[in-house]
Amino acid sequence: ADGFDQLIDLTAVDYLTYAGERTLPGGLTPERFEVVTSLINHVRRERIRIRTQVSADEPTIPSLFDLWPGSEYLEREAFDMFGITFADHPDMSRVLMPEDWVGHPLRKDYAVGAIPVQFKAASNER
């Protein structure tokens, strides 16, 4: 953690349909998924963004919960939306979608429109 005392954000990206070239440092191989973590060190007034490559074959990485308990909801959201599992997370369960929901809606290969959703009409009264 090297003095980075606050987790600012954690999110994920699915590069399945990305046609551009992704350049990573140190000869790292780009994977389908990337978990992006933003941290801050208040004493040194520094910020850091960590990009972690996650394999599509086994989309699992270690949880940050022991270092930054504030990651609990953010990791659950990444699991719910992208299907990325955070090993040793205290409650790796859905947080936005119903528990019986099939699939992960922010994956690029998710079947859009496969499940009809009835939206409530907006009222004309103001």
Residue ranges, per PLM feature:
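Terminal low-complexity/charged segments
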Residues: 1-126
